[in-house]
């Protein structure tokens, strides 16, 4: 977090910003950064619990949702190290939560749009791949407004976009002044110039295999926990539609 700037060669600035805050408070104490990481993880769990509570109207199912999430490798084994992946977790959850509030309510409020824009910007400034979630959210609202017409377009939706862009401006200026070094670093890491056609088949398969292995504890927990509850799944359920798009 030393030498804070609006960007760095490898990642956007938010994870460094929070690290610097803890350094100013606690100094070079290792335990402080382990604590920082767990604060972010627990915050994500709290938001997920709140979201699940609004979705299921059941505190038990909300707790089960958090327990299942805890069973995923990236929410337990890798969390002692505070990095960009941990940094984005609460903002990912908060974006989903405020998207749900806008999706579920009949009335679009300034507050919900404003906070969605804020958390979307902070999440993106934690890690660029956060954009995948934001694209999913945009596709969801495009679908329900312009295709299915479940909801009417409201210009207040644009508040979230405006807030998002305004908060990104300093980082975009920094990128321009530094020859887009963060983006070029990410592209260089892909190894596209030295890869063969076969690599585009083999490595994705290896990646999928690793992800399947990582999710084994989650699947085991799901089997024992979810079978105790009865669910009625309807393809016309708007809650299911929301979850499909977001995931």
Where in this protein do the model-derived segments appear?
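Extracytoplasmic catalytic/substrate-binding loops of multi-pass membrane glycan-assembly enzymes
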Residues: 6-19, 27-32, 179
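Short helix- or helix-capping micro-motifs
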Residues: 62-73, 120, 124
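Membrane-interface transmembrane helices that cradle and orient dolichyl/undecaprenyl
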Residues: 53-56, 95-115, 225-229
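Transmembrane alpha-helix segments characteristic
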Residues: 232-247
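Transmembrane-lumen/periplasm boundary regions of multi-pass, lipid-linked membrane glycan transferases
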Residues: 122, 134-235
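Membrane-interface alpha helices of multi-pass inner-membrane proteins
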Residues: 3, 112-128, 139, 164-166
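Transmembrane-helix motifs of polytopic, lipid-linked glycan transferases
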Residues: 35-56, 93-94, 98
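Short acidic/glycine- and proline-prone juxtamembrane loop motifs at membrane-interface regions
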Residues: 77-88
């Amino acid at each position: 977090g030393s030498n804070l700037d609006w960007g760095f060669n490898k990642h956007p600035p938010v994870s460094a910003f929070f690290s610097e805050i803890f350094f100013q408070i606690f100094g070079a104490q290792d335990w402080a950064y382990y604590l920082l990481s767990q604060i972010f993880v627990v915050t994500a769990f709290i938001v997920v619990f709140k979201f699940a509570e609004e979705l299921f109207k059941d505190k038990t199912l909300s707790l089960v949702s958090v327990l299942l999430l805890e069973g995923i490798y990236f929410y337990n084994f890798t969390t002692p190290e505070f990095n960009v992946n941990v940094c984005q977790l609460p903002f990912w959850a908060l974006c989903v939560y405020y998207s749900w509030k806008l999706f579920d309510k009949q009335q679009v409020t300034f507050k919900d749009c404003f906070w969605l824009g804020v958390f979307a910007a902070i999440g993106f400034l934690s890690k660029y791949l956060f954009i995948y979630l934001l694209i999913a959210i945009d596709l969801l609202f495009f679908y329900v407004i312009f295709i299915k017409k479940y909801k009417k377009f409201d210009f207040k939706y644009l508040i979230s976009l405006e807030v998002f862009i305004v908060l990104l401006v300093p980082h975009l200026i920094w990128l321009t002044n530094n020859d887009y070094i963060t983006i070029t670093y990410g592209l260089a890491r892909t190894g596209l110039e030295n890869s063969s056609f076969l690599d585009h088949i083999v490595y994705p398969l290896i990646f999928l295999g690793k992800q399947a292995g990582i999710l084994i504890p989650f699947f085991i927990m799901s089997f024992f926990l979810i079978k105790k509850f009865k669910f009625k799944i309807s393809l016309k359920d708007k809650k299911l539609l929301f979850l499909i798009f977001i995931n």
